[in-house]
Amino acid sequence: MMPPRLRILGIDPGLRNMGWGIVELLGSNLTYVASGVVHSDGKGELAHRLKDLHVGLAGVIDAYTPHEAAIEETFVNRDPQSTLKLGQARGIALVVPALADLAVAEYAANLIKKTVTGNGHAEKQQVAMMVKILLPKSDAGSADAVDALAVAITHAQLRRNPAALKSQAMIGQGR
């Protein structure tokens, strides 16, 4: 059963910049709560960069108390080392909400684009424009935060339709 107000954390995984966006769903109304980026030092040791992402994302969850989380699935890069590092950042994006007992959903980039813009191959500018239309009070300054809000919007749209949500992978039981 969905809480009266469902607060959703969207995450755009990245090793240097992990975007996050929070929306609230009340009935059919979707409202902007907050957004931002958790940064890690691009020159630091990998373990410390991952720790920075973990601490930053945990702080977002503590501050905004979302009920559920959703993450953009990452694509495979041509550079195996970059792919591995991004995968480790993605692991942080998955485990931090799970440690807070949030259910975590994952969505492909094309599904996010299609849900937000109607076009699964939309450009970043089109996604940003639709996020601003759907969440007029949003002030996401970075592309990473905009992408995270698009993830949260996608989860909210699919959350309204439980049959569609069941066809997507939900990880964890949540609160």
From Swiss-Prot:
One of its GO terms (cellular component) is Holliday junction resolvase complex. CDD domains: RuvC (cd16962). Binds 2 Mg(2+) ion per subunit. It comes from the Bacteria. PROSITE patterns: RUVC. The keyword Methyltransferase does not apply. One of its GO terms (biological process) is DNA recombination. GO terms for molecular function: crossover junction DNA endonuclease activity; DNA binding; magnesium ion binding. Mg(2+) 1 binds at residues 12, 144. Its cofactor is Mg(2+). Keywords: Cytoplasm, DNA damage, DNA recombination, DNA repair, DNA-binding, Endonuclease, Hydrolase, Magnesium, Metal-binding, Nuclease. It catalyses: Endonucleolytic cleavage at a junction such as a reciprocal single-stranded crossover between two homologous DNA duplexes (Holliday junction). Its EC number is 3.1.21.10. The active site is at 12, 72, 144. Gene3D superfamilies: Ribonuclease H-like superfamily/Ribonuclease H. Mg(2+) 2 binds at residue 72. It is found in: Cytoplasm. It is an enzyme of class 3 (hydrolase). NCBIfam families: ruvC (TIGR00228). Belongs to the RuvC family. The RuvA-RuvB-RuvC complex processes Holliday junction (HJ) DNA during genetic recombination and DNA repair. Endonuclease that resolves HJ intermediates. Cleaves cruciform DNA by making single-stranded nicks across the HJ at symmetrical positions within the homologous arms, yielding a 5'-phosphate and a 3'-hydroxyl group; requires a central core of homology in the junction. The consensus cleavage sequence is 5'-(A/T)TT(C/G)-3'. Cleavage occurs on the 3'-side of the TT dinucleotide at the point of strand exchange. PANTHER family: CROSSOVER JUNCTION ENDODEOXYRIBONUCLEASE RUVC. Homodimer which binds Holliday junction (HJ) DNA. The HJ becomes 2-fold symmetrical on binding to RuvC with unstacked arms; it has a different conformation from HJ DNA in complex with RuvA. In the full resolvosome a probable DNA-RuvA(4)-RuvB(12)-RuvC(2) complex forms which resolves the HJ. This is Crossover junction endodeoxyribonuclease RuvC.
